[in-house]
Amino acid sequence: MTNTTMQPNRLRIALQKKGRLSQDCAILLKQCGVKINWNEQRLIAYAENLPIEILRVRDDDIPGLIFDGVVDLGIIGENVLEEEELGRRAANETVTYKKLRQLDFGDCRLSLAVDRDCHYENVKDLANRRIATSYPYLLKRYMNENGVSFKSCLLNGSVEVAPSAGIAYAICDLVSSGATLEANGLKEVDVIYRSKACLIQRAEPLESTKQALVDKLLTRIQGVQQAAESKYIMLHAPKEKLEKITALLPGVENPTILPLASDTTRVAMHVVSQENLFWETMEQLKEAGASSILVLPIEKMME
């Protein structure tokens, strides 16, 4: 039975309690072999097989928990992290933390948008205009970098309605597909910040057992991400075409070459390769003489 008492020797990780990022974090931990007892009614969860406890909090609370040393690790969108950091620095507060790794989920962009009928050429068109946003510090930095004065209107939700409601001329908000902007009669005109989820650590040194666990998690996360970006490929190749076929398959290491039973002219080739443009690559492999091409997903990798 899992001990659910908060203990100082557990590695404490802050995660968003709801939403897509929360789901992606749960999947990542599972892929890394961390077994968590999730309970939607509880804000603290515990790992069954490792000394880890999860604090499930609001996403905008995670940077502060890291900056203040309350938790050891956090997974957070870079947009939220940088907005909080800029806000604290504007208040002359010291901000220290370690950014360990960018993750392969949580993609979004922070963009400027205006009414679809507005004429817009560049950010200078927003000079002295009122812009509604939930990210005032990221917006201010971008506008300052471009030498544009503006009026900021802070909204913590429903930013898209600001132009139609007469609250602001433009908005600066997170965009994924752009469907919400279109539904509200807006058009995206400038991307000011691109973001992914990232893993961060508090600045104060961890005790050796905790740091060893962090290092173990980092190795596993790297393996999960590399596996997601790669495929295991098996094929048959004429011996005289090996060099040409190998050149078409840039893998993480040299391919494994195996003899084929009762066939002295061909060999079997096994390789881990990137999936990028792989349909085109398969066609090139076939043209080069490869056959019996098999592409398999990889669940885990460790170099």
Swiss-Prot record:
<dbReference type="InterPro" id="IPR020621">
    <property type="entry name" value="ATP-PRT_HisG_long"/>
</dbReference>
<keyword id="KW-0067">ATP-binding</keyword>
<dbReference type="InterPro" id="IPR013820">
    <property type="entry name" value="ATP_PRibTrfase_cat"/>
</dbReference>
<dbReference type="Pfam" id="PF01634">
    <property type="entry name" value="HisG"/>
</dbReference>
<dbReference type="GO" id="GO:0000105">
    <property type="term" value="P:L-histidine biosynthetic process"/>
</dbReference>
<dbReference type="InterPro" id="IPR001348">
    <property type="entry name" value="ATP_PRibTrfase_HisG"/>
</dbReference>
<comment type="pathway">
    <text>Amino-acid biosynthesis; L-histidine biosynthesis; L-histidine from 5-phospho-alpha-D-ribose 1-diphosphate: step 1/9.</text>
</comment>
<dbReference type="GO" id="GO:0005737">
    <property type="term" value="C:cytoplasm"/>
</dbReference>
<dbReference type="InterPro" id="IPR015867">
    <property type="entry name" value="N-reg_PII/ATP_PRibTrfase_C"/>
</dbReference>
<keyword id="KW-0547">Nucleotide-binding</keyword>
<dbReference type="GO" id="GO:0000287">
    <property type="term" value="F:magnesium ion binding"/>
</dbReference>
<dbReference type="InterPro" id="IPR011322">
    <property type="entry name" value="N-reg_PII-like_a/b"/>
</dbReference>
<dbReference type="GO" id="GO:0003879">
    <property type="term" value="F:ATP phosphoribosyltransferase activity"/>
</dbReference>
<comment type="function">
    <text>Catalyzes the condensation of ATP and 5-phosphoribose 1-diphosphate to form N'-(5'-phosphoribosyl)-ATP (PR-ATP). Has a crucial role in the pathway because the rate of histidine biosynthesis seems to be controlled primarily by regulation of HisG enzymatic activity.</text>
</comment>
<dbReference type="InterPro" id="IPR013115">
    <property type="entry name" value="HisG_C"/>
</dbReference>
<keyword id="KW-0328">Glycosyltransferase</keyword>
<dbReference type="InterPro" id="IPR018198">
    <property type="entry name" value="ATP_PRibTrfase_CS"/>
</dbReference>
<keyword id="KW-0460">Magnesium</keyword>
<keyword id="KW-0028">Amino-acid biosynthesis</keyword>
<dbReference type="Pfam" id="PF08029">
    <property type="entry name" value="HisG_C"/>
</dbReference>
<keyword id="KW-0808">Transferase</keyword>
<keyword id="KW-0963">Cytoplasm</keyword>
<protein>
    <recommendedName>
        <fullName>ATP phosphoribosyltransferase</fullName>
        <ecNumber>2.4.2.17</ecNumber>
    </recommendedName>
</protein>
<keyword id="KW-0479">Metal-binding</keyword>
<dbReference type="GO" id="GO:0005524">
    <property type="term" value="F:ATP binding"/>
</dbReference>
<comment type="similarity">
    <text>Belongs to the ATP phosphoribosyltransferase family. Long subfamily.</text>
</comment>
<keyword id="KW-0368">Histidine biosynthesis</keyword>
